[in-house]
Amino acid sequence: MSRSIKKGPFVDKNLFKKIQAGDNKHQIKTYSRASTIIPEMIGFTINVHNGKTFVAVYIQENMIGHKLGEFAPTRKFISHAGAAKVGKK
């Protein structure tokens, strides 16, 4: 279910203040994975927390409308051992 249009997109107020006041030379750290990417964020590098570390996300024009958490995966993919990896006796 999408967010109501009359409410507008959610952006963490502290993150929004840093973007309004800051220059895009330094990276901004945030834990707010639910914040929506807005046009004012283009050109910034935002470090998004994935539960363990911060993942650097460079904001581009085609990311507008998505959430920050979409670009910082929380799970590490480890494939199962295949037949080539397992040695036979």
Curated annotation (Swiss-Prot):
A GO CC term attached to the entry: small ribosomal subunit
Protein name (database record): Small ribosomal subunit protein uS19
Entries under HAMAP family matching the protein: Ribosomal_uS19
Query: Please, which domain of life does this record's source organism belong to?
Result: Bacteria
- Which PROSITE patterns does this entry report, sorted A to Z? RIBOSOMAL_S19 (PS00323)
Q: Per the record, a Pfam family?
A: Ribosomal_S19
Q: What is a biological process (GO) this protein takes part in?
A: ribosomal small subunit assembly
InterPro entries tied to this protein: Ribosomal_uS19, Ribosomal_uS19_bac-type, Ribosomal_uS19_CS, Ribosomal_uS19_SF
Annotated function: Protein S19 forms a complex with S13 that binds strongly to the 16S ribosomal RNA.
Keyword Aminoacyl-tRNA synthetase appears in the UniProt entry: no
Lineage of source species: Bacteria, Pseudomonadati, Spirochaetota, Spirochaetia, Brachyspirales
